[in-house]
């Protein structure tokens, strides 16, 4: 019925093929194209010479080089690239000259029937290659670094011409090869080498100077050149020859070392200069600026900048990818010819068979070389882009305005740096699929058309339909990806904030509440992940089933059209369908990567366009041109520019050089904002700010960097011992240094966590002093230090070493005001009063309220003192003796005492990493997490069934299809195709089952691992957080967890799938010719050897890469926290340089991991080609009849993919092992030693405990770690219930440690603490901490609202909350905001002043109403008036309760019932204030006298004491 139509189709197809062959054969197409090309080339060359002669063009840099060469005697060391180009050019020239000679003697038969065309073509070729050879020789004389662009273009065109014609004629020829064929083959191989040289472009010359040093001849700026040389000299890749780069043998020395012993960080070589972060960042910055100038802001400018940055390297990668895609289809193209040869072996020459085998092998080798180069090139480009993006995200973070900073938390920005950048660089790897996809599809369709005629159209339509299905799926996937990233941002933001404030959570017993908050955010992320993976599983099912669907549709169409399905045609089609799997499989990954990178790129583009600090906010003048250091005229400033009420308004300020200006005022009056206006940190709405001179800034909340104390003080400046000693002495740090383990080289933990508040404050004051600035801005510098230290700082630092400097200092301590040349009184964002101390007292419009509150406090001290004994005025000698006495009591709270100096104790340990092979227990832990590993055998069974059904369907088609068009099929085509379709459908269903099981198992495992790690971290003791940088934990929670969520299950699955596939392939090949096993076994042994040789090096490099990623994030988090200080000290460039160094430290192992993978893949591919070539030669050599040609063709079909499969197996195993490091790292944090249980069921206290509030310490000793000395020593005392106990002592005497012991933040190493007859070590931590109240030294607010911060457990009514707010003096401030209780609190409470934050913390304890309240410097950051009000409120609200107060303000503790004086971690005194004051020699008595003397000394008059 369909026969006529089918016959017509077959005839039409045959005619098309014949016409194409005639066009190439009978007409002299090659010769004519060749002549045109040579003439064009020669014309261009002559024009170029003429233009050069007349001086129109000039070789870039050549004259400069020649001038340099005249100055010194230099010889050129030749390179492999140059030698191969010269050899190949001369070889091709010789070949054409010899052919020309034979043509003269009529000794050669040409394919072209026109002798004129043949002769003209050879003459033009000879002339062209003569020119080329001469130019190549001249290159050496002129010492050119790169081959001229015209020469490289010529080599490229020659290869295309040779490959297009010669390769086809040689492989299609059935007769024995002649001289012309061998000449063409020689030319083709030489052109291939020249193509490689032209792509690289470099001659590879080195200059050999007379001194004997060898260095590359590079043109351009010499300074830049020196930088390049320093990188290149130690970079094996930078110094590698062309051959070493092709074979990746430049990395051999690293493998040799890694095989002998585990690699260390210093063993990894440097990267090439073009891969260095500095080079990449600078290049990308240029592109950003150029694009922004041309196109303006918007997301498009970011995309265009990236495109401009990557296009050159991406274009080279694209050339390799296109050649790779083209050569991959030569195998399927030749299969039909090979089956025909085997079927008609008697009538054909064996040479033809061997030539076909050589064609197969050559195509596979070219495919391997180009594939390895484009994959490596893509990874290298990804590395460069990652370095550029990370550095720009970092640089942007240093200049974000306050509004932008509030809208982007550090957790979000860390996500940009870790996750989003990774997704963009991953897309660079996938982008080459865009060029390869059309080539692969149309190459496949061409081969199918050649063998199946118009049936190929059915294949094309089906392929396009399958690909079209991806569009709606991709749009849906993009939405899911966007949801995943938003959910991940929310989780990381919360995690980052919790880690920073973990101490507060533990003190307040809120850890469970915030643990549940993270779990809720993770549940949201989990739901998004499950939707994405479920869709991905369905997409995979469609695309894995696609080749089977396409083949069924194509074969059915052929049957209906009457196209004969011979064995050769079917096998060629099956091989082509197999090749089509690559673009179809790759499409969802490409689209997924495209979607993910688009979402990530939009996020980064949006971030890079956020507003920055105003560059013109401050005018900087020279000191010589003005006597004013700071001047503000008619200034208005606001943290929220859109707000109707500015933060500061009507600011007029003139500060002369050398003046001391004090700024005071109530909490939230704008004192810190005034300093920010001088720094240019706050948005300027109007007015002028002028500053003349270098600035130094000390923020209210100490910002301390991880590192040594000396590093923090020097802050990038050179160490000058005399200046340094002077600074340290002025900042009262000498005694602390003596008592630190390593003096000023003692290492500080993250955010100075192992330092007391006073020590951190003095270290950052020393940092400012050492900079020798002209203007000093000190924000409440005395709040965290005791009375004696405060006086010492004021006298020796502010009035001593800084006496000639301009100093603006914010303070709540009135005793430091009289010495100021100018006092500014702030109120509601305005300067209400300005003048000297005496002038302001006389004005009676506000200042006297602050002074009055201080007077009251001082009066209370004096009255108690006088009632105890007669107060005597202290002389200067008394003052000196008191100071001397106080000095003897100094110690360091958190550090090692003098007797332990010799013992090194590093607080922040280097990140723990495993060594050697990843343990089996890690794999087992991962595989057996979900249902004890029950899903694993089902997944393997599903894949095995898929593979068996695939082989069965292909075997069925090869066995049943007739060997020739004339043969009769064994069964009807309808039945053949029905069985084939059923087998194909079965295999697709197996894929669906497998993908769903992998998605379920992988995500469930990831969720279990996350839950375990999260609970382990939350239950870790504070010592873990003290010694572990936040970035280290965040790295595991973001990057490593992302690997488990989306990659790990797929990578492990692919290990099993690829092994099953290769076993199936070997089975089919051994069925065809069992002799293949003879060669396969030793090759398999070689593969295993290579894999084992590779693994130790790659594993350690991967671990290093993972470890080196955390410092980038940690450094970034620290820099964001101290961005204001960095800008104030003008240290941006230094911090950016540190960031670039850290990026390079990560890039080094990462680059060598990528190189190592390519090294392995290249060698494994070559070994698999060896097996394939052996099997082909075996099939050609075996006598006819020994083997069925159709089955032999099936073996070749499977053999074509052997190299890919073999490389895939090893690649997947290595990749899975590298990814398994993330599992290993998460497991490490799932086994952190836990602190005591939250609840102990058998030992739960009564509901009303503690009802009395008595606290008994018995022989208490506390140390921070086993190798650290005791910080508290033999503390034995009792705090009676319902009493007020004051705890005093010099900075670092152990006061805060006592409180930490009370809350069991640190466990006693000896002794007990008993509260109301309950030993606190016997009850659960939650039962203990939830019954105690505390206002900590560092006030912490969480991202959210005021309501959430006051009542995070949602236990109280609005009425109760408002009552607490009014009591803690925040009622008016909060009512003034539109949102009231829902007023926004940003990360760290940055939009509230430090004093307001402390008042919110007070509100918490007023709500909690505990019977025991601890105040740890609770009012250090509020003014005296507010402090007085707060003390009254506490006395009223906690009248019959136990209140333990730590304070540096003596008046805060003078009215206590009992005072505990700590010194050197021991109890110095413990009695009532009155009794202690009766003893002249008591420590407390001396503290009181010191405070009185200080106030009296600085008042300068009796006004203060009246």
Swiss-Prot record:
A single MF term (Gene Ontology): ABC-type xenobiotic transporter activity
Keyword Membrane tagged: yes
EC number: 7.6.2.2
Stored PROSITE patterns: ABC_TM1F (PS50929), ABC_TRANSPORTER_1 (PS00211), ABC_TRANSPORTER_2 (PS50893)
Positions of ATP 2 binding: 1289-1296
Binding-site residues for ATP 1, renumbered to this chain: 665-672
Superkingdom, natural source: Eukaryota
Listed transmembrane segments: 37-57, 84-104, 116-136, 150-170, 179-199, 315-335, 350-370, 427-447, 452-472, 541-561, 567-587, 934-956, 976-996, 1048-1068, 1167-1187, 1191-1211
Domain ABC transporter: 630-853, 1257-1489
SMART domains for the chain: AAA
Tissue: Ubiquitous.
Subcellular location: Membrane
Membrane topology value: Multi-pass membrane protein
GO biological process, one term: response to nematode
Catalysed reaction equations from the record: ATP + H2O + xenobioticSide 1 = ADP + phosphate + xenobioticSide 2
Pfam families (alphabetical): ABC_membrane, ABC_tran
Residue ranges of every copy of the ABC transmembrane type-1 domain listed in the record: 314-596, 936-1218
Keyword Kinase: no
Top EC class, one word: translocase
UniProt keyword annotations, A-Z: ATP-binding, Membrane, Nucleotide-binding, Repeat, Translocase, Transmembrane, Transmembrane helix, Transport
GO CC annotations, alphabetized: membrane; plasmodesma
Function: Pump for glutathione S-conjugates.
Assigned protein family: Belongs to the ABC transporter superfamily. ABCC family. Conjugate transporter (TC 3.A.1.208) subfamily.
Protein name as annotated: ABC transporter C family member 9
């Amino acid at each position: 019925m369909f026969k006529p139509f089918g016959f017509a189709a077959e005839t039409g197809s045959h005619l098309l093929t014949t016409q194409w062959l005639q066009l190439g054969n009978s007409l002299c197409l090659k010769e004519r194209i060749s002549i045109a090309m040579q003439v064009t080339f020669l014309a261009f060359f002559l024009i170029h010479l003429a233009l050069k002669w007349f001086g129109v063009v000039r070789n870039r840099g050549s004259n400069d080089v020649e001038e340099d060469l005249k100055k010194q005697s230099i010889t050129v060391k030749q390179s492999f690239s140059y030698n191969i180009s010269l050899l190949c050019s001369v070889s091709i020239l010789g070949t054409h000259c010899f052919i020309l000679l034979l043509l003269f003697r009529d000794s050669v038969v040409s394919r072209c029937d026109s002798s004129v065309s043949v002769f003209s073509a050879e003459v033009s070729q000879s002339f062209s290659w003569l020119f080329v050879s001469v130019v190549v020789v001249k290159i050496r004389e002129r010492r050119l670094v790169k081959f001229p662009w015209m020469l490289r273009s010529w080599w490229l065109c020659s290869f295309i011409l040779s490959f297009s014609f010669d390769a086809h004629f040689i492989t299609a020829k059935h007769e024995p090869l002649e001289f012309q064929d061998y000449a063409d083959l020689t030319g083709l191989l030489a052109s291939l080498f020249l193509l490689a040289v032209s792509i690289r472009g470099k001659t590879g010359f080195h200059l050999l100077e007379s001194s004997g040093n060898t260095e590359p001849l590079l043109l351009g700026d010499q300074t830049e050149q020196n930088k390049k040389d320093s990188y290149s000299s130690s970079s094996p890749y930078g110094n590698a020859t062309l051959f070493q780069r092709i074979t990746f043998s430049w990395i051999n020395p690293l493998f040799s070392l890694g095989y002998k012993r585990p690699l260390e960080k210093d063993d990894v070589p440097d990267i090439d200069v073009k891969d260095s972060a500095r080079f990449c960042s600078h290049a990308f910055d240029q592109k950003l600026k150029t694009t922004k100038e041309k196109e303006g802001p918007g997301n498009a400018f970011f995309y265009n900048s990236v495109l401009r940055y990557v296009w050159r390297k991406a274009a080279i990668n694209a050339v390799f990818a296109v050649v790779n895609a083209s050569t991959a289809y030569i195998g399927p193209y030749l299969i039909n010819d090979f089956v025909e040869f085997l079927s008609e072996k008697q009538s054909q020459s064996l040479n033809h068979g061997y030539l076909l085998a050589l064609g197969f092998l050559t195509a596979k080798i070219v495919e391997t070389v180009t594939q390895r180069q484009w994959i490596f090139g893509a990874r290298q480009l990804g590395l460069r882009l990652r370095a550029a993006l990370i550095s720009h995200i970092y640089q942007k973070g240093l200049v974000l305005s306050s509004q932008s900073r509030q809208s982007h938390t550090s957790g979000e920005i860390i996500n940009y740096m870790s996750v989003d950048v990774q997704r963009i660089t991953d897309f660079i790897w996938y982008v080459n699929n865009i060029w390869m996809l059309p080539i692969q599809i149309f190459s496949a369709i061409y081969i199918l058309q050649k063998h199946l005629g118009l049936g190929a159209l059915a294949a094309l339509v089906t392929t396009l339909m399958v690909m079209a299905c991806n569009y709606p799926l991709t749009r849906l996937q993009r939405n899911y990806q966007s949801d995943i990233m938003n959910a991940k941002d929310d989780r990381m933001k919360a995690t980052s904030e919790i880690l920073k404030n973990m101490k507060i959570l533990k003190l307040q017993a809120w850890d469970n509440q915030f643990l549940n908050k993270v779990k809720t955010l993770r549940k949201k992320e989990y739901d998004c992940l499950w939707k994405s993976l479920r869709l991905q599983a369905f997409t995979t099912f469609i695309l894995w089933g696609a080749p089977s669907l396409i083949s069924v549709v194509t074969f059915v169409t052929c049957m209906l059209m009457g196209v004969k399905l011979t064995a050769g045609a079917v096998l060629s089609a099956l091989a082509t369908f197999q090749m089509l799997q690559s673009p179809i499989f790759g499409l969802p990954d490409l689209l997924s990567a495209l979607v993910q990178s688009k979402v990530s790129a939009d996020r980064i583009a949006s971030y890079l366009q956020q507003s920055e600090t105003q560059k013109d906010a401050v005018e900087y003048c020279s000191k010589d041109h003005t006597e004013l250091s700071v001047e503000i005229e008619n200034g208005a400033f606001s943290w929220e520019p859109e707000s109707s009420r500015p933060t500061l308004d009507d600011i007029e300020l003139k500060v002369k050089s050398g003046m001391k200006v004090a700024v005071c005022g109530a909490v939230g009056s704008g004192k810190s904002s005034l300093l920010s206006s001088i720094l240019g940190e706050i948005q300027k709405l109007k007015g002028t700010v002028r500053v003349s001179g270098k600035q130094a800034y000390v923020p209210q909340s100490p910002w301390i960097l991880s590192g040594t104390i000396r590093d923090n003080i020097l802050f990038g400046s050179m160490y000058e011992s005399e200046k340094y000693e002077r600074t340290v002495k002025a900042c009262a740090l000498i005694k602390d240094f003596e008592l630190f383990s390593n003096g000023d080289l003692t290492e500080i933990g993250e955010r100075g966590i192992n330092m007391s508040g006073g020590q951190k404050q003095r270290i950052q004051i020393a940092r400012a002093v050492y900079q020798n600035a002209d203007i000093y801005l000190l924000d409440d510098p005395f709040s965290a230090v005791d009375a004696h230290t405060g006086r010492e700082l004021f006298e020796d630092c502010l009035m001593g070493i800084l006496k000639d400097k301009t100093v603006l200092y914010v303070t709540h301590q009135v005793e430091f005001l009289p010495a100021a040349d100018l006092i500014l009184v702030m109120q509601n964002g305005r300067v209400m009063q300005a003048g000297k101390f005496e002038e302001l007292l006389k004005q009676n419009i506000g200042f006297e309220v602050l002074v009055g509150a201080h007077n009251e406090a001082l009066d209370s001290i004096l009255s108690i003192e006088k009632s105890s004994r007669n107060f005597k005025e202290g002389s200067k000698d008394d003052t000196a003796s008191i100071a001397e006495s106080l000095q003897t009591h100094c110690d360091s709270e958190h550090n090692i005492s003098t007797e332990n100096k010799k013992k090194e104790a590093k607080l922040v340990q280097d990140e723990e990493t495993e060594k050697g092979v990843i343990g089996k227990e890690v794999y087992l832990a991962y595989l057996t997490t979900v249902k004890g590993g029950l899903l694993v055998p089902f997944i393997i069974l599903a894949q095995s069934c898929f593979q068996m059904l695939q082989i069965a369907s292909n075997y069925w088609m090869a066995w049943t299809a007739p060997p020739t068009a004339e043969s009769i099929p064994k069964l009807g085509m309808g039945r053949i195709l029905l069985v084939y379709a059923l087998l194909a459908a079965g295999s697709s269903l197996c894929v669906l089952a497998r993908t769903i099981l992998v998605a379920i198992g992988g995500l469930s495992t990831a969720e279990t691992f996350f839950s375990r790690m999260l609970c382990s971290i939350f239950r870790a003791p504070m010592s873990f957080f003290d010694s572990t940088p936040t970035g280290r934990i965040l790295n595991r929670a973001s990057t490593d967890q992302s690997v488990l969520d989306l990659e790990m299950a797929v990578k492990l699955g692919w290990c099993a799938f690829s092994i099953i596939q290769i076993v199936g392939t070997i089975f089919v090949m051994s069925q065809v010719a069992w002799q293949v096993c003879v060669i396969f076994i030793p090759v398999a042994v070689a593969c295993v050897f290579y894999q084992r040789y590779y693994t130790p090096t790659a594993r350690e490099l991967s671990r290093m890469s993972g470890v080196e990623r955390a410092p980038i994030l940690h450094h970034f988090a620290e820099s964001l926290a101290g961005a204001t200080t960095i800008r104030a000290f003008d240290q941006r460039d230094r911090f950016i340089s540190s960031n670039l160094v850290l990026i390079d430290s990560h890039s080094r192992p990462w680059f060598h991991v990528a190189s190592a993978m390519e090294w392995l893949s290249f060698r494994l591919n070559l070994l698999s080609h060896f097996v394939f070539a052996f099997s082909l030669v075996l099939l050609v050599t075996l006598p006819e009849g020994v083997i069925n040609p159709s089955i032999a063709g099936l073996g070749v079909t499977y053999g074509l993919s052997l190299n890919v499969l073999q490389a895939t197996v090893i690649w997947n195993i290595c990749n899975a092992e590298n990814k398994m490091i993330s599992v290993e790292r998460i497991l490490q944090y799932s086994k952190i030693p836990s602190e005591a249980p939250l609840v102990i069921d058998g030992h739960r206290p009564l509901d009303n405990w503690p009802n009395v509030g008595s606290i008994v310490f018995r022989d208490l000793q506390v140390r921070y770690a086993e190798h650290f000395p005791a910080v508290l020593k033999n503390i034995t005392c009792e705090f009676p219930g319902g009493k007020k106990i004051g705890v005093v002592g010099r900075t670092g005497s152990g006061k805060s440690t006592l409180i930490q012991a009370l809350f069991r933040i640190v466990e006693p190493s000896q002794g007990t603490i008993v509260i109301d007859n309950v030993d606190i070590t016997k009850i659960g931590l939650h039962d203990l901490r939830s019954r105690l109240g505390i206002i900590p030294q560092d006030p912490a607010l969480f991202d959210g609202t005021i309501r959430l911060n006051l009542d995070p457990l949602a236990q109280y009514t609005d009425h109760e909350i408002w009552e607490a707010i009014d009591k803690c003096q925040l009622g008016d401030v909060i009512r003034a905001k539109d949102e009231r209780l829902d007023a926004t609190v940003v990360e760290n409470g940055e939009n509230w002043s430090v004093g307001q934050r402390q008042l919110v913390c007070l509100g918490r304890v007023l709500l909690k109403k505990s019977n025991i309240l601890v105040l740890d410097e609770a009012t250090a950051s509020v003014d005296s008036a507010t402090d007085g009000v707060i003390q009254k409120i506490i006395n009223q609200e906690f009248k019959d309760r136990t209140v333990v107060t730590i304070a540096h303000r003596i008046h805060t503790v003078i009215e206590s019932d009992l005072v505990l004086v700590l010194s050197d971690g021991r109890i110095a005194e413990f009695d009532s204030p009155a009794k202690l004051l009766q003893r002249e020699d008591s420590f407390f008595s001396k503290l009181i006298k010191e405070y009185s003397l200080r106030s009296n000394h600085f008042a300068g008059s009796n006004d203060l004491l009246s």
